[in-house]
Each structure stands twice: as C-alpha cells, then as structure tokens.
Swiss-Prot record:
Subcellular location: Nucleus; Chromosome; Nucleus, Nucleolus
Top-rank taxon, per record: Eukaryota
Species annotation: Drosophila melanogaster (Fruit fly)
Name this polypeptide is given: Poly [ADP-ribose] polymerase
Positions occupied by motif Nuclear localization signal: 208-210, 223-228
Key word NAD present: yes
Family membership noted in the UniProt record: Belongs to the ARTD/PARP family.
Length: 994
C-alpha cells in the first residue's frame, strides 16, 4: 500500500479557499500548501489550505518528500519549497555572540518551560502525570494528529525526562536559553541549568539535509538540466491546454491515443493531457487493461479496477509509451499542438523520499495489531500513591494542604466517594457522627485513615497499601488492593482524538420488528415505514484498505405514530470512531419520502432499491449489511427477577454464565468487531456464512501463492460483511494463515452467539417464569449437579488431577461444579455406536460463549464454507485425554478465569494412527476415527473401565521417549457427530500463577 503523505501542494483552482493561517483568500493559480487532516464529519482526509509563507509559520515538514504532488509543480516552485524545508532549523544549539537567524527564532518558539498549571498533563518521556506546580518543559510538535490539525501540539516533560531526551528533541543549548526560564524561582533555575548544560558544538549531531541541488559532475548537471527542460516543456503544454482547449477536444485527443480521460478532477485531466503531449501515450495496464494512469510521486499508478471491490493500483516507474498522435482537425484548431514530438520520451522525476517519521507512521497504521501499545521512553519509579484516589471527610480547614500532599505523592483527590476510592482521610470523631458520606464509605468497605497515614507514606514510600490497613481507624474495610486501578496502557487507537469519548452501546426501541435509530431523536414518536414487502431501513458499509476507508451509512424512512408525517434520517461516518454526522429531513407525503429514500440508496450503492434482492456491487459504492435489530428488552439481567427460579442454585449459576450478555459482548470486542454498528446478535446467519466463504477464498489464494491484489479484494469484502473497529488505523490486510485461523475462530464464536441470541429472541418474556428457567428449557438439555462426595465425582476429579500436562503450568484447574449432561435426542443418535469397540471418555474445551450452541445443538463439525486452517487432521470434532490440552481452548485469562469443559463418550472404533499432521477429507472404509499419537499420555495400564465398557484414561502421565512423533499429546478426531455422546460438563476455575 502507498504511503499516506501528510501535506499536499498545488496551484489554487479557484479564488475561494481561505488560508488557515492569515484567514485571507488564496488567489487562483497561486501555489498553496495543505495539511491533510481527518475530517470530523466524513471518513476521509480533507485539506487545510495555507499560503506558502503561512504554511511554514504553522508547520515544520521534515522532508520535501512529505509533500504530495510536488513532482507536478513548476521546477522553480519545487526548488523554492525544497529550500524552505531545508532551512527549517530543528535543533537549538548554543549561539553565543552570534546573531540569531529567523529559522533559529522560529524553532526556539517550539520550546518552553513553566510550572504545571494542573496535574492533568502527562510526561511524554515516562508517561506519568506531571503534578501541579512542578517544573515542566515543552516541545511543540507538528507531525501528530493534533499538531497537524491545530498547527502544533505541546508535548510536556518532567525536567529529568527532558534532559535524557534532549538530543532527539533537538535542544543542545543551555536550559537558561529556553523561553520561560526567567519566570522560574532561583532554586528551580539552578536545577534547570544543572540538568541541561550547553552541549559543545563539536558534539552536535550532523543535521545537514540532502539538498535538491545535484553535485557538479557532468552527468548529474545534465540530469538537472533535463529535469528543468522537461518541466518547462510540460508546463508550456499544460498552460495552453488549460487556457485554450475545450474539454470535449481534450477528451477527443486522449481517446484518439487510447487514453481514458480522468473524470471528476479537471486539474488531473490537464496533468494527464500535458503528460501525453510531452512524453507520449502510455500502453494499457497489463493487470486490468485500463488506459488511465496518474502521476504518483516518482512514477505512474494505474487508476483502473481489479474488481468492483478493489482498485488496480499497479505502479510503473517507466511505462512503455508510443508517440502521441494529434488529429488534423485539432492541429488546425490549436496551433500549439503542431509542436508535439513524434518520438516518445521517458519522464524523469526528482527523488523526494518521505521523512523517516512518515514511514514510521505508515508502518504503524498498517500494523497487524491495531492495539500497538505506547510504551514509556524513560523508566521512572512511580510515586507511592500514583493513580490512587483519596477523599476527605471533615477536616475542612486542612483540605487544601492535604490535597497538595496527596498529589505530591502521586495520588488523586476526589470529593465524590466511589468504589474506586482507595481510602478516606478523616478522624474518629467524624466516624462517630455517622454522616451520609461516612455511611456510604462503610457500605463500600473503604478504609478510614488518619492524617498520620500521609506521614508514614512520606517516610516509607514503598508501604502505602500496608499503611492503609495498619493505620485504619474504622471497624470496616475490604482488601484495599481490590480498589487499586488497573494500569491503563495506551494504544495507537486510544491516543486518537477520534476514538475518545465513544458512545456506549445503545438500546434500540423496536416497533413491529424494526428498530428506530435513537440518534434520530424520534424513537418515541415514530416507526420505520413499511410498504408491502419494502422495509425502508438499510445499513450500508464499505471497507477499502487502499484508501483507508472503513465507512458506514444508515438510512431510515420514519413515519409518525399518530399522524401523516414522514422523515428521512441518515447517519454516516467511520466505524469505531466519533467521525461522522447525521441529517434529518421532513416530508409531507409518503411518496416524496420514498422517492428520496430510493435516490439515496441508488446514489450510495449504484443499485435501484427495487432490485436489492439482485444486488450487484459497484466500484467505489457501498454494500448492504444484513443487520436485524430486535427488542433489547429481552436481554434481561439475571441478578434479580420477580419470579423465583425452580432450578438448583448451581444450575442457575451455570445458565447465568452461558447466557451472560456481557460475556458475549466482551468476546466480540476481543475480535475487534464493532459493537455500535453491529450490536450483539444483529448480524444474520447468511452474512456469517458469506464471511466464511471469503475467509476460505483467502486461504485458497495463500495456498496458490500470495497475490496482493486478490488479498486486498477479499479483505475489503470480509470487513464489509463483518464490520470491524480499527479506529483511525488502516484496516489490516488479511495475508497469513494465522490471521485466517483467528478469523475462523471468530466466525465460529459469532455463529454460536447467534444461536444463543436466537434462543433469547424466541422466548416469551410475558411468561410467568424466571428467564433462567426459560433459557434452560430452550437448550433442551438436562443438567444435574454431581454430589461432590460421590465415587463418580472422585473418579472424574482424579482424571483432572492426573492429566494436567507439565507444559501447561501457567495455571491450575479447580473444579467448581460437575454436571451430568443428557442432551435431548443425543443418546438415541449415539445408540448405533454404543456397540462399537474402543469407546473413551475424552475432554473437549471451548469458549464460554459457545456453550449455548453446544448444549442446544451438540458438538458440530465446521461447515464446508469454513477454511481448513487450524484442523491438523481435517474438519472433525477434536478430543484429548489430557485435561489441560483441551482447557487451553477455553480461552480464559487472569481477568476471565472461569471456563467450561466437556467429557464425552466418544466411539473411536478402529483408529487411523498418525504421528504428524495429515489433513483428512475422508477416512478409509475400515477406519472409524483418527488418532494423533503424542509422546506424553495417561498411563494406559492405569485406565478405569466403567461397567458399560467405556475407558476413562485417568492414569498418571508417562512419556514414550522412543516414539518419533511431532505431537506432544494424544488427539482423537471423529468425523461423524453421531459418534459423540456428551456426558459431563465441568465448571472450572483457572488459577493463574503468571
């Protein structure tokens, strides 16, 4: 993918643009330079235009190569811009006795020193807060999202952190030369001078830039002259084309030379025509047969389409050309066309490489992990109360002093008491008064500590938490460690101004099966208009990684509930951000509203609304997403309900767990699925199947040898079908087998969650029944908790204890409950295999969110449209005799430590044995299952044989050192769902040690 350049230079097309610097208009045809910033209202970059001189007052480009379109400027303007960029001074060195240049004074303004006005700013060295009244130092930068949009962003530093980073920040002078130094107190001035002494000139880094001027060798001098001559000839033609030729004649000239005219951009059309007259006609693209090439940096890029989803973007440095042929009638009309040469020539370009930071930003934007963490540059020990929240009850005369002491120790003072308050500073007298705030503190279990607590912490900076317990003066208090806020790690996405303050998922009010978008403000007085088979509500999407687009567009025709009044509501923007806008239009009649709705649909998709069932994707247009909004009132909270459940407590807790809406939402968020545009359960099963097919297609492309154009095409389709939240980062190209496996697992989870959601939707909330009992009835599975004192429980516990592998020691497994499982119809389905020899009780693990689907439909084999990745022995149902091997598939963590596992009776019969991966499409006639033999296994001589002949391989593990196998542990695979009879469900607690 092409590097996204931060600036754009061109000649003003009209005289209407206003300079963002001086606020005056920019005259037509004068050179103007733009900062390309993200629009707050559309999923696109927009130019903030400046006069040339105003631009350099507001921005500090590091390289002329960061300026898009510079190669299409006049030679003199290229030269001037290069000189201006080169003259920007980025470092401040000691200039004793020297007259300071304008560039030096401009650079000096980017630095400053002062006392922190609050405790809100963050040091960009150590990423810790800078407390109020501490000395802080500023470097204003211009290459950040904020800096580019607002003409600079001040980045603050502690004095010690700035001193360590001074070289890369570009400050080599003494600290006393920094603006603001004189405003500091004498002792702070001394600290600054000591921390930031001047650096000798001979120790300065080489800051010279590569200049545009070439060295004086004959060859390079000739190249420079050729560049100038070509540029002059090019602009002679361009000026004549712009000032003299009619557009229809330009089109005739281009088409006569088999060049497809650029549409929608007159200036690019002039560029294309001038290039034709100066250098000759470019041959058609070998990839897509397009006849339209656009100048791009130091070459030409094909403007054709690989498919309706993807641009071709083939890049040519030196395209094959033929001589430009001018029709006689045009020569007669335009005299300058008689000067066109009859021999094609090669266009040479100046090499303007982008700055390293531009490369870096581009690499970060294309990083496969869009949550790349921002790590501190400077290690710094956190103050003892860092990020801990304190409050005060009473002690009114000492509030100001106590607040300052808390903040000096790194803590935060908050008037409001909350569950995140670590402790409250007060007195025994205030405890006896039992004020409302004190009672609330007792309810939350927050410790009350005296003022002396701060004395202890100031004397012993490592014992803050222990002093909360030891100095506590109240009779209550939960573990203070539980109230320590988790360290928040910043990511590239969270740093963006367009991903902060994102709205939480909203409740949709459903009327007649259709939801009114709450952003319309009409959800209480209107409903979605329905006309025969037409439901006038659509959600459109488009992901295009070549243009960094991840857009949505929603349109609804709404009718007032009580009168003849109609509205068209539409909203649009970038998925996962606050970029976007909306519009509400009122109509008097349904016909005018329908006409407007259909016009919008046709404009955005290129399809007529009446033909939506035969939808054809159009190049650059949007695609409908099948999202079905249902009544969110059915997503009840299980904590309290009017009707008492008839289920055992352990079964109630299990049903709560597997039907937990928050867990399902968290799972979708882990996969970066956009929860605003695609709330839980709203994506159709058909759309999920389509996504499976796209992922399988990507797998086939990789198997046949990676083809970037095909991968981009399929990636665009996948992310359009399944909206993902990439924030402002570039959507990730799907190009590895690991990504395919991750997406397959995501779609598996989506499919299972869709089952759970369908069950919830089908329930009648008006029933005089607890929702847990409703859920339980819907899964059609009997669950009975085993007595923990029974022999059956003891045998199964031994199976867990003995088969935990030595390579899986990051956690221990604690059994919370074991349930005997009887799925409706499964025993009957399994009956033919009950007579088969070699039946074992084996483990299977899966995500929590998959268990509604598993219990209601049984364990299933991946659908045909799913890619074959992740299946070592083909698509089947996988089991293990080592508990921890299956436990790893529960996808638990220290934060989400509850997992569910199954023990199933598996009819293995005659097994095809393998010691390495072998993809099996179909077993041979005399085999019933596949056995991947691992080197470590439960001791087969110690197995327990049940009365019905089923083997429980619960022996202690042994290792066969002589076996040549690539597998660590045994795997068992069956390819017929009828060979599985689920018998037990374990609720496990994963006790992580690290």
């Amino acid at each position: 993918m092409d590097i996204e350049l931060p600036y754009l230079a061109e000649y003003a097309r009209t005289g209407r643009a206003t300079c963002k610097g001086c606020k005056s208009t920019i005259s037509k045809d004068t050179l103007r330079i733009a900062v390309m910033v993200q629009s707050a209202f559309h999923d696109a970059k927009v130019p903030n235009w400046f006069h040339k001189t105003c631009f350099f007052k507001n921005q500090r480009p590091s390289s002329v190569g960061d300026i898009q379109n510079i190669g299409n400027l006049r030679f003199a303007d290229q030269k001037e811009l290069t000189d201006l960029v080169e003259n920007i001074q980025e470092v401040i060195s000691a200039q004793l006795g020297k007259k300071r240049s304008k560039a030096f004074n401009l650079a000096l303004k980017d630095f400053g020193i002062e006392y922190a006005k609050s405790s809100r700013s963050t040091c960009r060295g150590c990423e810790q807060k800078i407390n109020k009244d501490l000395v802080r130092l500023r470097k204003t930068v211009y290459d950040t999202e904020v800096g580019m949009k607002y003409g600079g962003q001040p980045l603050w530093h502690h004095l010690e952190c700035f001193a360590q980073l001074r070289s890369e920040l570009g400050w080599f002078a003494s600290g006393e030369d920094m603006p603001g130094f004189q405003s500091l107190a004498d002792d702070d001035q001394a600290k600054v001078k000591n921390a930031i002494p001047p650096i000798k000139s001979e120790e300065l880094p080489d800051t010279k830039r590569a200049k545009m001027e070439l060295s004086d060798t004959n060859e390079e001098g000739e190249k420079k002259q050729r560049l100038k001559d070509q540029n002059d000839a090019y602009f002679r033609f361009r000026d004549d084309i712009k000032n003299k030729m009619k557009k229809k004649d330009i089109d005739i000239l281009l088409k006569f030379n088999n060049q497809q005219p650029v549409t929608g951009d007159t200036e690019k059309l002039f560029d294309q025509t001038a290039d034709l007259l100066t250098f000759g006609a470019i041959e058609s693209c070998s990839e897509c047969n397009s006849c339209q090439f656009i100048v791009n940096k130091s070459g030409y890029i094909c403007n054709g389409n690989h498919s309706e989803w993807t641009k071709c973007n083939k890049l040519l440095k030196e395209p094959t050309r033929s001589a430009c042929i001018v029709p006689k009638e045009l020569k007669a009309l335009y005299n300058f066309l008689n000067t066109v040469k009859e021999i094609p020539s090669t266009r040479i370009f100046n090499n303007f490489p982008p700055n390293k930071s531009t490369f870096s930003r581009s690499l970060l934007k294309t990083n496969k992990n869009n949550d790349v963490l921002v790590r501190p540059t400077i290690p710094r020990i956190s103050p003892p109360l860092y990020n801990l929240k304190f409050s005060i009850i009473g002690l009114k005369n000492q509030h100001k002093e106590l607040r300052k002491r808390i903040e000096n120790l790194g803590g935060k003072f908050e008037v409001k008491i909350s569950e995140n308050t670590i402790a409250i500073i007060s007195t025994e007298l205030e405890i006896q008064k039992k004020s409302t705030r004190m009672k609330f503190a007792e309810e939350l279990g927050i410790h009350i500590v005296p003022i002396e607590f701060l004395d202890f912490v100031e004397a012993d900076t490592e014992g803050a938490i222990k002093y909360i317990n030891s100095t506590c003066i109240c009779s209550w208090g939960t573990d203070p460690k539980s109230r320590i806020p988790k360290e928040t790690t910043k990511s590239l996405n969270s740093n963006s101004i367009y991903t902060k303050s994102m709205p939480v998922s909203r409740t949709f009010k459903v009327k007649d099966g259709l939801a009114v978008d709450p952003d319309s403000g009409l959800e209480d007085i209107a409903h979605v208009y329905v006309d025969s088979n037409n439901k006038y509500s659509v959600v459109l999407g488009l992901t295009d990684i070549q243009r960094n687009k991840n857009s949505y567009y929603k349109v609804q025709l709404l009718k007032a509930d009580k009168k003849e009044k109609y509205w068209i509501f539409r909203s649009w923007g970038r998925i996962g951000t606050n970029i976007g806008n909306s519009k509400l239009e009122e109509f008097d009649t349904s016909e005018s509203a329908k006409r407007n709705f259909k016009e919008i649909y046709a404009d955005k998709t290129g399809n007529e609304y009446e033909q939506r069932d035969n939808f054809v994707k159009r190049t650059g247009r949007m695609y409908p997403i099948e999202i079905q909004y249902d009544d969110d009132q059915k997503l009840v909270k299980h904590e309290s309900h009017f009707f008492t459940s008839k289920l055992e407590i352990s079964v109630q807790n299990l049903i709560k767990l597997i039907f937990d809406i928050d867990s399902m939402n968290k799972t979708l968020m882990e996969f970066h699925i956009d929860m605003d545009k695609m709330p839980l359960g709203k994506l159709s099963a058909h759309q999920i199947q389509s996504a499976y097919r796209v992922v399988k297609e990507i797998y086939n492309v990789l198997e046949c040898g990676s083809n970037t154009a095909k991968l981009i095409d399929a990636t665009n389709r996948f992310y359009t079908l399944i909206p993902h939240n990439f924030g402002v980062q570039l959507p990730t190209l799907i190009e590895t087998h690991q990504q395919i496996e991750d997406l397959r697992q995501m779609l598996d989870s989506l499919a299972e969650i869709e089952v759970a959601y369908s069950i919830i939707k089908s329930e009648d909330v008006s029933d005089a029944c607890n929702p847990l009992d409703n859920h339980y009835a819907q899964i059609k599975t009997q669950l009975v908790a085993l007595d923990k004192n029974s022999e059956e429980f003891s045998i199964l516990s031994q199976y867990v204890k003995n088969t935990h592998a030595s390579t899986h020691k990051s956690y221990d497994l604690k059994i919370v409950d074991v349930f005997k499982v009887s799925r409706q119809g499964e025993a009957r389905r399994f009956k033919p295999f009950k007579k088969l020899h070699n039946r074992k009780l084996l483990w299977h693990g899966s995500r929590l969110t998959n268990f509604v689907g598993i219990l209601s439909h049984g364990l299933r084999i991946a659908p045909p449209e799913a890619p074959p990745t992740g299946y070592m022995f083909g698509k089947g149902i996988y089991f293990a005799d080592m508990v921890s091997k299956s436990a790893n598939y529960c996808c638990t963590s220290q934060q989400n430590s509850t997992g569910l596992m199954l023990l199933s009776e598996v009819a293995l019969g005659d097994m095809m044995e393998c010691t390495s991966a072998k993809y099996i499409n179909k077993l041979s006639n005399n085999k019933h299952s596949c056995f991947g033999r691992g080197r470590t296994m439960p001791d087969p001589t110690k197995s327990y044989i049940r009365s019905d002949g089923v083997e429980i391989p619960y022996g202690e593990t042994i290792t066969d050192e002589h076996l040549k196998s690539s597998l660590l542990y045994n795997e068992y695979i069956v390819y017929d769902v009828a060979q599985v009879n689920i018998q037990y469900l374990f609720r496990m607690e994963f006790k992580y040690s690290y």
